[in-house]
Amino acid sequence: MAAMLEFRTSGYNPYAVKYSPYYDSRVAVASSANFGIVGNGRVFALGLTAQGLIAAGGDGSLKLFDLAVDEFPVMNFHEHKRETFSVCWNPVTKDTFVSSSWDGTVKIWSPTRPHSLRTLPIGSCTYSTSFCPSNPALISAVSSDSHLRIFDLRTPTSAKYHLVSTIPVHAAGSPPAEALTHDWNKYNDTVVATGGVDCIIRTFDTRSPAAGPLCLMQGHEYAVRRLAWSPHASDVLISGSYDMTVRLWNDASAHPSGPLAGAKPGHQLGVMNRHTEFVTGVDWCLFGVGGWVASVGWDERVLLWDSNILMGPGPRR
C-alpha cells in the first residue's frame, strides 16, 4: 500500500492512538511495556503541540500532560479501583472529561479539580465511554454485560443516576458478548456504533432502545477492539481488531430500506492488513481531503495511511 507512514514504539506495545483536533500532523499514542501485563507505560507525542492530553493507566489512575511544562504530569486523578480502560474529552465544552474502568463505573472530571465531579454506576466491567459529539450532557458507555447505556446529566441524579436508556447489544435469545468499543456518529447524533467479542459491528438509534440494530457489519475474524466513525462522511466508519486487520465500512444508511424488517447488512469497503499483531487503536484525521487514518497495534508500530486507497479500483489490500 502506498501513502503510508510508520513510527516504531520500540519496547512498548501501543494501546490507543488519537489525532490532535487542532493540527493534522500531530498524533498521541499510549503504550505499555510487556503488552500491558507488567512494567511501565509511555505516551508518545508525535509532533503534538503544547495542548493538554489525558492518559488512562492500568493502575486506575488518570494523568494530565502539558508538553509546555517540564514536570510531567501536571495533574493526577486516582479514584478508579481497577484499570481505567478509556477516557474522552467533552468535545463541546472542552472543560470536562469522562473515564471508564473495569471497576464498573464511569467518572466525570474537571482538569482543574483532583476529585471526580460525578460517578455513574454501570455494575460491570466498562470498556468504553464517550460524550455525544453535539450535546455535552449526554454520555454513553458499553460494558461486559453486552449493553450500551446512555446517561443524560440534565436529569435528576435520583433518576437512576442520570441513566435514560439501556440498549442490549446482543440479539434477543442470543448469549451476551462483551462490548469493547463504541462511537457516536458525527453527523447523526442519535446513532451509535458498537463492537466487541462477537466480531460484529452494530449501529443503534438511541431513540429506540428496543428496536434492535439498524445495521450489522460482519467480516472481522476476532474481537473488534476499536472503531471510529468518519468525521468526513456520515455512513463510513473504521475498525481495528484482534485479527490484526483494520477494516473500512459503509453502514448502508444512505440506501433506502427494503420491505423486510430488521437490520441492514453493511458493506466492507476494504481491508488494511499491514499490522502483524493485535490492532488496538484507530482514529481519523479531522483535516485535509478526508481519509487519513492512524492505526496502532501490539507490533510496536504506528501506521498513518490514506483510507481512500481502500476504496479505489483494483484489489483492496
PLM features per residue range, with description:
Residues F7-N13, A50-Q51, F77-T84, L120-T126, ...:
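WD40/WD-repeat beta-propeller blade N-cap
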Residues A2-F7, D24-T49, L67-D70:
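Beta-propeller domains
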Residues D283-R317:
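Blade-level signature of beta-propeller repeat domains, shared across WD40, Kelch, NHL, RCC1
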Residues Y19-D24, V87-K94, R113, T129-A137, ...:
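Loop/turn segments within WD40 beta-propeller blades
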Residues L46-T49, L67, D152-A159, D205-P209, ...:
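Short loop/turn segments immediately following beta-strands, especially the blade-tip
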Residues A30-A33, G39, A56-D59, S99-D103, ...:
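Conserved strand-to-loop turn within each blade of WD40 beta-propeller repeats
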